[in-house]
Protein backbone atom coordinates (compact mmCIF):
# COMPACT_ATOMS: atom_id res chain seq x y z
CA UNK A 1 0.00 0.00 0.00
CA UNK A 2 2.32 2.73 -1.28
CA UNK A 3 0.03 5.41 0.06
CA UNK A 4 2.45 8.30 -0.13
CA UNK A 5 3.18 7.73 -3.81
CA UNK A 6 -0.20 9.39 -4.28
CA UNK A 7 1.05 12.63 -2.80
CA UNK A 8 1.95 14.95 -5.69
CA UNK A 9 4.63 17.64 -5.32
CA UNK A 10 2.34 20.59 -6.00
CA UNK A 11 3.61 23.20 -3.56
CA UNK A 12 6.53 25.54 -4.11
CA UNK A 13 9.01 25.68 -1.20
CA UNK A 14 7.52 27.60 1.67
CA UNK A 15 9.83 30.43 2.59
CA UNK A 16 7.83 32.23 4.27
CA UNK A 17 -0.61 22.41 29.35
CA UNK A 18 1.09 20.11 30.90
CA UNK A 19 4.51 21.20 29.92
CA UNK A 20 7.58 19.06 30.14
CA UNK A 21 10.97 20.44 29.31
CA UNK A 22 14.03 18.62 28.14
CA UNK A 23 17.66 19.58 27.94
CA UNK A 24 20.22 17.98 25.68
CA UNK A 25 23.51 18.48 23.89
CA UNK A 26 22.57 15.53 21.65
CA UNK A 27 22.81 16.29 17.94
CA UNK A 28 20.35 14.37 15.83
CA UNK A 29 20.80 10.94 17.38
CA UNK A 30 17.99 8.45 17.75
CA UNK A 31 18.62 7.99 21.46
CA UNK A 32 16.06 10.59 22.43
CA UNK A 33 16.08 13.69 24.58
CA UNK A 34 15.25 13.14 28.23
CA UNK A 35 12.08 14.77 29.52
CA UNK A 36 12.06 16.33 32.96
CA UNK A 37 9.33 17.53 35.22
CA UNK A 38 8.76 21.27 34.73
CA UNK A 39 4.99 21.68 34.66
CA UNK A 40 4.84 25.46 34.62
CA UNK A 41 4.49 25.83 30.86
CA UNK A 42 7.10 28.63 30.96
CA UNK A 43 10.78 28.61 30.09
CA UNK A 44 13.44 30.70 31.75
CA UNK A 45 15.23 30.80 28.39
CA UNK A 46 12.45 32.79 26.76
CA UNK A 47 11.26 36.29 27.62
CA UNK A 48 7.47 36.11 27.67
CA UNK A 49 5.83 38.21 24.97
CA UNK A 50 9.01 39.10 23.09
CA UNK A 51 10.76 36.72 20.72
CA UNK A 52 14.50 36.16 20.94
CA UNK A 53 16.73 36.87 17.97
CA UNK A 54 19.36 34.43 16.78
CA UNK A 55 22.11 36.31 18.63
CA UNK A 56 20.09 36.35 21.86
CA UNK A 57 19.55 32.59 21.63
CA UNK A 58 23.27 32.00 21.12
CA UNK A 59 24.15 34.32 24.00
CA UNK A 60 21.76 32.48 26.33
CA UNK A 61 23.27 29.10 25.43
CA UNK A 62 19.85 27.50 25.03
CA UNK A 63 17.12 27.17 22.40
CA UNK A 64 13.52 26.31 23.30
CA UNK A 65 11.60 24.25 20.75
CA UNK A 66 7.94 23.24 20.96
CA UNK A 67 7.16 19.66 19.95
CA UNK A 68 4.32 17.19 20.39
CA UNK A 69 4.60 14.76 23.29
CA UNK A 70 1.80 12.42 22.17
CA UNK A 71 2.07 12.16 18.38
CA UNK A 72 4.05 9.00 17.73
CA UNK A 73 6.19 8.68 15.59
CA UNK A 74 6.74 12.42 15.03
CA UNK A 75 6.95 13.80 18.54
CA UNK A 76 6.29 11.77 21.69
CA UNK A 77 7.66 10.78 25.08
CA UNK A 78 8.64 7.12 25.27
CA UNK A 79 8.36 4.70 28.19
CA UNK A 80 11.74 5.85 29.50
CA UNK A 81 10.63 9.47 29.64
CA UNK A 82 12.62 10.56 26.59
CA UNK A 83 11.40 12.61 23.67
CA UNK A 84 11.53 10.73 20.39
CA UNK A 85 10.37 11.17 16.81
CA UNK A 86 11.00 12.75 13.44
CA UNK A 87 10.56 16.32 14.70
CA UNK A 88 12.68 15.69 17.79
CA UNK A 89 15.56 14.33 15.68
CA UNK A 90 15.55 17.60 13.71
CA UNK A 91 15.32 19.69 16.89
CA UNK A 92 18.42 17.98 18.27
CA UNK A 93 20.34 18.77 15.09
CA UNK A 94 19.31 22.43 15.23
CA UNK A 95 20.64 22.74 18.78
CA UNK A 96 23.87 20.97 17.85
CA UNK A 97 24.55 23.20 14.85
CA UNK A 98 23.74 26.33 16.85
CA UNK A 99 26.09 25.15 19.58
CA UNK A 100 23.49 25.53 22.32
CA UNK A 101 21.57 23.39 24.79
CA UNK A 102 18.15 22.10 23.73
CA UNK A 103 15.00 22.55 25.79
CA UNK A 104 11.88 20.83 24.48
CA UNK A 105 8.42 22.01 25.50
CA UNK A 106 5.33 19.96 24.61
CA UNK A 107 2.59 21.78 22.75
CA UNK A 108 -0.93 20.89 21.68
CA UNK A 109 -2.11 21.45 18.12
CA UNK A 110 -4.32 24.39 19.10
CA UNK A 111 -1.56 26.08 21.12
CA UNK A 112 1.21 26.15 18.52
CA UNK A 113 0.47 29.65 17.25
CA UNK A 114 -0.09 31.01 20.76
CA UNK A 115 3.24 29.63 22.00
CA UNK A 116 5.00 31.64 19.29
CA UNK A 117 2.88 34.76 19.70
CA UNK A 118 3.69 34.85 23.42
CA UNK A 119 7.31 33.75 22.90
CA UNK A 120 7.01 30.69 25.10
CA UNK A 121 9.19 28.90 22.55
CA UNK A 122 11.69 29.97 19.92
CA UNK A 123 10.64 27.44 17.27
CA UNK A 124 7.68 25.14 16.71
CA UNK A 125 8.54 21.72 15.26
CA UNK A 126 5.23 19.96 15.73
CA UNK A 127 3.94 18.64 12.40
CA UNK A 128 2.96 22.23 11.62
CA UNK A 129 1.13 22.43 8.28
CA UNK A 130 1.68 25.65 6.35
CA UNK A 131 -1.59 27.52 5.73
CA UNK A 132 -2.33 31.08 4.66
CA UNK A 133 -4.22 31.75 7.88
CA UNK A 134 -1.35 30.60 10.08
CA UNK A 135 1.19 32.48 7.97
CA UNK A 136 -0.54 35.71 8.96
CA UNK A 137 0.40 35.04 12.59
CA UNK A 138 3.72 33.19 12.42
CA UNK A 139 6.61 32.93 9.98
CA UNK A 140 7.17 29.55 8.34
CA UNK A 141 10.59 28.37 7.24
CA UNK A 142 11.25 26.02 4.32
CA UNK A 143 9.38 22.70 4.47
CA UNK A 144 10.92 19.41 5.57
CA UNK A 145 7.96 17.08 5.04
CA UNK A 146 4.75 16.84 3.01
CA UNK A 147 1.39 15.33 3.93
CA UNK A 148 -2.29 15.14 3.08
CA UNK A 149 -5.19 14.20 5.35
CA UNK A 150 -6.27 10.64 6.10
CA UNK A 151 -9.25 9.02 7.81
CA UNK A 152 -8.98 5.97 10.07
CA UNK A 153 -12.01 3.95 11.21
CA UNK A 154 -12.88 0.55 12.71
CA UNK A 155 -12.62 -2.52 10.48
CA UNK A 156 -16.27 -3.22 11.24
CA UNK A 157 -17.40 -0.01 9.51
CA UNK A 158 -14.57 1.30 7.34
CA UNK A 159 -14.99 4.82 5.97
CA UNK A 160 -13.71 4.89 2.37
CA UNK A 161 -15.24 8.20 1.28
CA UNK A 162 -15.61 11.32 3.43
CA UNK A 163 -19.21 11.66 2.21
CA UNK A 164 -19.99 8.54 4.25
CA UNK A 165 -19.43 10.65 7.35
CA UNK A 166 -22.39 12.96 6.69
CA UNK A 167 -24.61 12.71 9.75
CA UNK A 168 -21.95 10.74 11.59
CA UNK A 169 -19.35 11.70 14.18
CA UNK A 170 -15.78 12.43 13.16
CA UNK A 171 -13.10 12.84 15.80
CA UNK A 172 -10.59 15.65 15.21
CA UNK A 173 -7.98 17.50 17.22
CA UNK A 174 -8.55 21.20 17.78
CA UNK A 175 -6.45 23.54 15.70
CA UNK A 176 -5.59 21.00 12.98
CA UNK A 177 -6.05 21.16 9.23
CA UNK A 178 -8.49 18.26 9.54
CA UNK A 179 -10.79 20.38 11.70
CA UNK A 180 -10.65 23.22 9.17
CA UNK A 181 -11.08 20.96 6.14
CA UNK A 182 -14.19 19.17 7.38
CA UNK A 183 -15.73 22.35 8.77
CA UNK A 184 -15.42 24.02 5.37
CA UNK A 185 -16.14 21.09 3.06
CA UNK A 186 -18.42 18.72 4.99
CA UNK A 187 -20.72 20.81 7.21
CA UNK A 188 -23.04 17.82 7.79
CA UNK A 189 -20.31 15.88 9.55
CA UNK A 190 -20.52 16.12 13.33
CA UNK A 191 -17.09 17.02 14.69
CA UNK A 192 -16.08 15.73 18.10
CA UNK A 193 -13.06 17.84 19.09
CA UNK A 194 -10.23 17.06 21.49
CA UNK A 195 -7.23 19.03 22.71
CA UNK A 196 -4.71 16.20 22.51
CA UNK A 197 -3.98 13.37 20.10
CA UNK A 198 -3.98 10.70 22.79
CA UNK A 199 -7.48 11.82 23.82
CA UNK A 200 -8.65 11.56 20.21
CA UNK A 201 -7.25 8.06 19.72
CA UNK A 202 -8.74 6.90 23.01
CA UNK A 203 -12.12 8.23 21.88
CA UNK A 204 -11.82 6.31 18.61
CA UNK A 205 -10.78 3.12 20.39
CA UNK A 206 -13.71 3.50 22.80
CA UNK A 207 -16.20 3.90 19.96
CA UNK A 208 -17.15 7.48 20.75
CA UNK A 209 -16.83 8.44 17.09
CA UNK A 210 -17.17 6.79 13.71
CA UNK A 211 -13.71 7.80 12.50
CA UNK A 212 -10.73 10.04 13.18
CA UNK A 213 -8.99 12.38 10.74
CA UNK A 214 -5.57 13.97 10.87
CA UNK A 215 -2.41 13.81 8.75
CA UNK A 216 -2.30 10.60 6.71
CA UNK A 217 1.25 9.97 7.92
CA UNK A 218 -0.07 9.82 11.47
CA UNK A 219 -3.21 7.72 10.99
CA UNK A 220 -1.34 5.16 8.89
CA UNK A 221 1.30 4.73 11.59
CA UNK A 222 -1.38 4.40 14.27
CA UNK A 223 -3.43 1.85 12.31
CA UNK A 224 -0.35 -0.29 11.74
CA UNK A 225 0.16 -0.65 15.48
CA UNK A 226 -3.54 -0.92 16.39
CA UNK A 227 -5.23 -4.00 14.87
CA UNK A 228 -8.91 -3.56 14.16
CA UNK A 229 -8.59 -0.19 12.43
CA UNK A 230 -8.10 0.72 8.78
CA UNK A 231 -7.11 3.90 6.95
CA UNK A 232 -9.93 3.81 4.40
CA UNK A 233 -9.24 7.33 3.11
CA UNK A 234 -5.51 7.49 2.44
CA UNK A 235 -5.16 10.92 0.84
CA UNK A 236 -7.66 13.75 1.21
CA UNK A 237 -7.39 17.43 0.37
CA UNK A 238 -4.22 19.14 -0.79
CA UNK A 239 -0.66 17.95 -0.47
CA UNK A 240 0.55 20.28 2.26
CA UNK A 241 3.95 21.40 3.48
CA UNK A 242 5.12 20.73 7.03
CA UNK A 243 7.60 23.38 8.16
CA UNK A 244 9.27 24.91 11.21
CA UNK A 245 7.68 28.14 12.45
CA UNK A 246 9.02 31.12 14.38
CA UNK A 247 7.43 34.22 15.87
CA UNK A 248 6.26 36.77 13.32
CA UNK A 249 9.10 39.09 12.40
CA UNK A 250 11.94 36.97 13.81
CA UNK A 251 13.95 37.37 10.62
CA UNK A 252 17.38 36.38 11.90
CA UNK A 253 16.21 33.05 13.30
CA UNK A 254 14.07 32.37 10.22
CA UNK A 255 17.02 32.95 7.89
CA UNK A 256 19.24 30.67 9.97
CA UNK A 257 16.67 27.85 9.82
CA UNK A 258 16.24 28.26 6.05
CA UNK A 259 20.01 28.17 5.57
CA UNK A 260 20.21 25.11 7.81
CA UNK A 261 17.53 23.20 5.88
CA UNK A 262 19.21 24.08 2.60
CA UNK A 263 22.64 22.97 3.83
CA UNK A 264 21.33 19.71 5.32
CA UNK A 265 20.26 18.59 1.86
CA UNK A 266 23.91 17.91 1.03
CA UNK A 267 23.92 15.03 3.51
CA UNK A 268 20.30 13.97 2.88
CA UNK A 269 19.61 14.67 6.54
CA UNK A 270 15.85 14.17 6.44
CA UNK A 271 16.24 10.79 4.75
CA UNK A 272 18.51 9.85 7.66
CA UNK A 273 15.89 11.25 10.04
CA UNK A 274 13.25 9.06 8.37
CA UNK A 275 15.46 5.98 8.63
CA UNK A 276 16.11 6.63 12.33
CA UNK A 277 12.56 7.45 13.42
CA UNK A 278 9.95 6.37 10.85
CA UNK A 279 11.27 3.42 8.83
CA UNK A 280 10.58 0.89 11.56
CA UNK A 281 6.99 2.12 11.79
CA UNK A 282 6.10 2.24 8.10
CA UNK A 283 8.25 -0.60 6.77
CA UNK A 284 7.62 -1.22 3.07
CA UNK A 285 4.23 0.50 3.13
CA UNK A 286 5.61 3.97 2.50
CA UNK A 287 7.85 5.42 -0.17
CA UNK A 288 9.97 7.80 1.91
CA UNK A 289 10.60 10.09 -1.06
CA UNK A 290 6.88 10.81 -1.11
CA UNK A 291 7.07 12.12 2.46
CA UNK A 292 10.57 13.52 2.97
CA UNK A 293 11.52 16.97 1.69
CA UNK A 294 15.20 17.86 1.29
CA UNK A 295 16.51 21.39 0.89
CA UNK A 296 13.02 22.85 1.24
CA UNK A 297 12.07 21.68 -2.27
CA UNK A 298 8.62 20.10 -2.43
Give the role of each language-model region.
Residues 114, 128-136, 183-184, 205-239:
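A ligand-binding cleft/hinge motif common to bilobed small-molecule-binding domains
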Residues 153-170:
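Flexible hinge/capping segments at coil-to-helix
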Residues 103-114, 157, 174-177, 192-202, ...:
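Short helix-initiation/N-cap motifs at beta->coil->alpha
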Residues 145-153, 220-261, 281-298:
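Periplasmic-binding protein-like
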Residues 18-22:
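C-terminal motif of bacterial Sec signal peptides marking the signal peptidase cleavage site
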Residues 28-29, 47-48, 180-194, 231-235, ...:
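Ligand-binding clefts/hinges and TM-proximal coupling segments of bilobed small-molecule sensing domains
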Residues 32-38, 42-127:
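Extracytoplasmic small-molecule ligand-binding "clamshell" domains
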Residues 24-26, 35-48, 88-97, 176, ...:
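Extended ligand-binding regions for polar small-molecule ligands
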Amino acid sequence: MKVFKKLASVFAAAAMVLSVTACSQNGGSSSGTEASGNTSGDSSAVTQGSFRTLDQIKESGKIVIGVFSDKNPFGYVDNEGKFQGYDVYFAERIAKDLGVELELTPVEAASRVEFLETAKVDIILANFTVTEERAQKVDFALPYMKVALGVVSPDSAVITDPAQLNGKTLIVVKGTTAETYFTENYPDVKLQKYDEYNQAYTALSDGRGDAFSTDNTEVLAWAMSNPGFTVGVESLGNTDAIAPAVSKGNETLLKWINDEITALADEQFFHADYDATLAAVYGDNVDKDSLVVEGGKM
